[in-house]
Swiss-Prot record:
It comes from Metallosphaera sedula (strain ATCC 51363 / DSM 5348 / JCM 9185 / NBRC 15509 / TH2). One of its GO terms (molecular function) is proton-transporting ATPase activity, rotational mechanism. Belongs to the ATPase alpha/beta chains family. This is A-type ATP synthase subunit A. Its main location: membrane. GO terms for cellular component: plasma membrane; proton-transporting two-sector ATPase complex, catalytic domain. The keyword Disulfide bond does not apply. ATP binds at G233, P234, F235, G236, S237, G238, K239, T240.
């Protein structure tokens, strides 16, 4: 293993000499405090190291110790419900040891608790043939998640020994595999390098929607399990609240929340609210399915890159167990800014706006780790990693490099509009700029499981909103009175779509989460309102009279916050009222 000396210190970048045996991306310990760093460039016997802790006080001549291994994380029981820093060190345990709210430099703590015992139930027996990814046994980690202990990738052979059911620590051997004459011990935990994607048998097309309970995300711009999404938006437009809604209410079995360079208060909000909130799909506390990686804005800049890779590696580990995983990163712009900072210190040739020229390949590497896969091992199982990331363009400029590069690699775009946020329209997703490439892929699921008319109603709503935008231009020029009655109706229906469907209060107990069935019922009411009103307009009834006489519309708008997901029969009453009022209107008009 390489051992050298510090030659130069420039913020989080340390240049060490005498490192001719070092390797790219090798983890090293820098200086007397033994700060963790990673080699990002080698020139002769000089190694350029990005240090993941504060380098204050490190001086030339101090030793640098190589580890001979890349940056790796521990994977096993004990991850769920925990809060870690960007290097996957447990923050709760660090606080207990240091008795301080701050992380001391050079502190080394394993990710997984070595003393805690887990109840292991074997699923294979002595003499069985094992392949990478086979389920050796299970541990009930939380009330919500059964942790499956897998044969590590690249281990195969015959099971020479497997322990009996009982309580074991993560470092205990639970099996011994005879691999071509060598005895390979298998522990409950395994290590994996964060920059290397975990292997799988086959990548599949995403076909099932990842339901989020947020109406505009589920219906207008749906994301599939194994999909990629970006949420760009300026300061104050609601990125964090939208991502928190995703992590709270989405149908994913596991949620990895990575706070990358954002304010610490946002992680605090999550930590305070998650233990109290119940998962709407299972009724269990949300924290039982969540892992939080906190790398806030006051932590070292270089560790932002580590936290992004750590988050996606955790997601792949749970995916390999056969789970649908959602990884939420807030925000990838801060990671890109860290790359720019380090690139500048390493005197690399800058590209657009000072970002390094390899920005696009790094962003692509990250998003390419999403997907729905058939995993290694038996029994056959399928898992997915869905990546949803916030992007924070300065001043809301979507043409800046991070946003425009991200757009090339994601298939769902949820752009936040500050003018909608100022008008108190939340979530402030611009329905004219956004897009989803998964609509065709997930339509079959909605049609089969929720409503046969789902695609017709969804397309009608999108068409109405686009037409409303065209009509607004005319109204600005010549005023609303010049419009034909059918165009006035389009404006009224678009208003109803926005008020009754697109607007959603993330802090309302009922409105925060809409089941797929509830979403379809609201859509159906709006669709029928349009049909009945179009019929009335064709019979000569002016739109103003329709608006005055159809008094059930405010009830339809309020229904999102008054009708619970298990009270859908109340929509039948609204449907009957709507029909009765239109029948009465037609009778009065003699049409």
């Amino acid at each position: 293993m390489a051992q050298g000396k510090v030659a130069r210190v420039n913020g989080p970048l340390v240049v060490a000499e005498g490192m001719k045996d070092a390797q790219m991306f090798e983890v090293v310990e820098v200086g007397e405090p033994r700060l963790v760093g990673e080699i990002t460039r080698i020139e002769g016997d000089r190694a350029y190291i990005q240090v993941y802790e504060d380098t204050s006080g490190i001086r030339p001549g101090e030793p640098v110790f190589g580890s001979g291994a890349p940056l790796s994380v521990e994977l096993g029981p004990g991850l769920l419900g925990q809060l870690f820093d960007g290097l996957l060190r447990p923050l709760g345990e660090i606080k207990e040891i240091t008795k301080s709210p701050f992380i001391k430099r050079g502190i080394k703590l394993p990710t997984l608790n070595r003393e805690k015992e887990w109840h292991f139930v074997p699923k294979m027996k002595k003499g069985d043939k094992v392949e990478p990814g086979d389920i050796l046994g299970v541990v009930q980690e939380t009330g919500l998640v059964e942790h499956r202990i897998l044969v590590p990738p690249y281990v195969h052979g015959k099971l020479k020994e497997v322990v009996a059911e009982g309580d074991y620590k993560v470092e205990d051997n639970v099996a011994i595999v005879d691999m071509n004459g060598d005895e390979v011990p298998v522990k409950m935990m395994q290590k994996w390098p964060v920059r290397v994607p975990r292997p799988f048998k086959e990548k599949l097309d995403p076909s099932q929607p990842l339901l989020t309970g947020v109406r505009i995300l589920d219906t207008i711009f749906p994301i599939a399990k194994g999909g990629t999404a970006a949420i760009p938006g300026p300061f104050g437009s609601g990125k964090t609240v939208t991502l928190q809604s995703l992590s709270k209410w989405s149908e994913a079995k596991i949620v990895i929340f990575v706070g990358c360079g954002e304010r610490g208060n946002e992680m605090t909000d999550e930590l305070r609210s998650f233990p109290k909130l119940k998962d709407p799909w299972t009724g269990r506390p949300l924290l039982e399915r969540t892992v939080m990686v906190a790398n806030t804005s006051n932590m070292p800049v270089a560790a932002r890159e580590a936290s992004i890779y750590v988050g996606v590696t955790l997601a792949e580990y749970f995916r390999d167990q056969g789970y649908d995983v959602l990884t939420v990163a807030d925000s990838t712009s801060r990671w890109a800014e860290a790359l720019r900072d380090l690139g500048g210190r390493m005197e690399e040739m800058p590209a657009e706006e000072g970002f390094p020229s390899y920005l696009s390949s790094r962003i692509a590497e990250y998003y390419e780790r999403a997907g729905r896969v058939r995993t290694l091992g038996n029994p056959e199982r399928y898992g997915s990693v869905t990546l949803a990331s916030a992007v924070s363009p300065p001043g809301g400029d979507f043409t800046e490099p991070v946003t425009s590069t991200t757009l090339r690699f994601v298939r769902v775009f949820w752009p936040l509009d500050v003018s909608l946020a100022q008008a108190r329209h939340y979530p402030a997703i611009n329905w004219l700029q956004g897009f989803s490439s998964y609509v065709d892929l997930v339509s079959d699921w909605w049609i089969k499981n929720v409503d046969p008319d789902w695609r017709i109603m969804r397309d009608f709503m999108v068409r109405t909103l686009l037409r409303e935008d065209e009509l607004k231009q005319i109204v600005r020029l010549v005023g609303p009175e010049s419009l034909a009655e059918k165009d006035k109706l389009t404006l009224e229906v678009a208003r109803l779509i926005k008020e009754a469907f697109l607007k959603q209060n993330a802090y309302d107990d009922i409105d925060a989460f809409s089941s797929p069935q509830k979403q379809a019922r609201i859509m159906k009411l709006i669709y029928h309102y349009n049909q009945y009103a179009t019929n009335a307009v064709e019979r000569g009834i002016p739109v103003k009279k329709i608006v005055d006489k159809i008094t059930v519309v405010p009830d339809i708008i309020r229904s999102k916050a008054t009708i619970k997901n298990n009270e859908l029969q109340k929509y039948d009453e609204l449907e009957n009222k709507l029909k009765a009022q239109f029948d009465e209107l037609l009778k009065e008009a003699g049409a």
